[in-house]
């Protein structure tokens, strides 16, 4: 059922369909599902906000972490905070009422920040891949990655993300409630007059999903080949090679985490867009959508768990300047220092 600013995945034969901005949508799914949704959003908030804020705080507190190669990882944390503050809080509040209580303006705000965070994350991973490729594979001779290059990379992520999230606010496509009608996203569902949804969805999938994905896979493919060749030739010490492989595993795991979170959402959205008129329930879009939001806790967890230097700094911060595990981490510190010397470590 299509309304002026919404689309309900249900045929209104019984006359029960109501605007998701004004009435509870309990006729779509069991009311208990909204409680589960609210609890899940609360979990993402209480985990996502502290861990991303801690990522920023620890990096800013410890000078040795404030390197150009870490700028893009700070950008990832900022993007996740945008999703937590601007997206998850409104979704949790709406789920408590069973409909999107914040109205049309609130839908635009929630949809904008949630999509902005996702796009910044995707483009940050693309820029991160380019940076690693340039540093490790050295496709440009005599090139030294510096602060200006890092700032340019961060700026690129914001420009590209805004190029995807601003158009729906000014008439090229739009943000509407989706799934269980408690969160908003791009209108993949309708061909409403005056919004040119078809062209925007094609533009979004081509330039803001497939293109950065190509960059990520190309750069990491070349990086893996370079690391393998270096290990085979034993051009560097075993410790350095081990540290470089550790960094490679970290960034690859970050990409896998992103794909696990966002690929189902993108696939379902594309299916809905290319199968106009097909019947699908609210959970068909809601489950991938809310599963995708868990990406806000993937990146910092992966970064903290797989980067020994960052983990040491985090422990020092949490224990007020002391590291109770200093003896256990001594060997790890040596490996990370070797990684830093090779200009591959993200710390």
Swiss-Prot record:
Gene Ontology terms: cellular component: membrane; photoreceptor disc membrane; plasma membrane
Q: Give me the ranges of the annotated region Disordered.
A: 326-347
Site: Plays an important role in the conformation switch to the active conformation. Where?
110
Organism expressing this protein natively? Sargocentron spiniferum
**What's its job?**
Photoreceptor required for image-forming vision at low light intensity. While most salt water fish species use retinal as chromophore, most freshwater fish use 3-dehydroretinal, or a mixture of retinal and 3-dehydroretinal. Light-induced isomerization of 11-cis to all-trans retinal triggers a conformational change that activates signaling via G-proteins. Subsequent receptor phosphorylation mediates displacement of the bound G-protein alpha subunit by arrestin and terminates signaling.
Q: Which residues are glycosylated?
A: 12, 197
Source taxon at top rank: Eukaryota
Composition bias, Low complexity: 335-347
What are its GO biological-process terms? Answer: absorption of visible light; G protein-coupled opsin signaling pathway; visual perception
Q: Where in the cell is it found?
A: Membrane; Cell projection, Cilium, Photoreceptor outer segment
Residues with N6-(retinylidene)lysine modification: 293
Q: Does the keyword Ribosomal protein apply?
A: no
Spell out where the chain crosses the membrane: 34-58, 71-93, 108-130, 150-170, 200-221, 250-271, 284-305
Stretch forming the signal peptide: none
Motif 'Ionic lock' involved in activated form stabilization, chain ranges: 131-133
Q: How does it sit in the membrane?
A: Multi-pass membrane protein
Q: Which GO terms describe its molecular function?
A: 11-cis retinal binding; G protein-coupled photoreceptor activity
Q: Tell me what this protein is called.
A: Rhodopsin
Report the PTM annotation. Phosphorylated on some or all of the serine and threonine residues present in the C-terminal region. Contains one covalently linked retinal chromophore.
Q: Which InterPro entries match?
A: GPCR_opsins (IPR050125), GPCR_Rhodpsn (IPR000276), GPCR_Rhodpsn_7TM (IPR017452), Opsin (IPR001760), Retinal_BS (IPR027430), Rhodopsin (IPR000732), Rhodopsin_N (IPR019477)
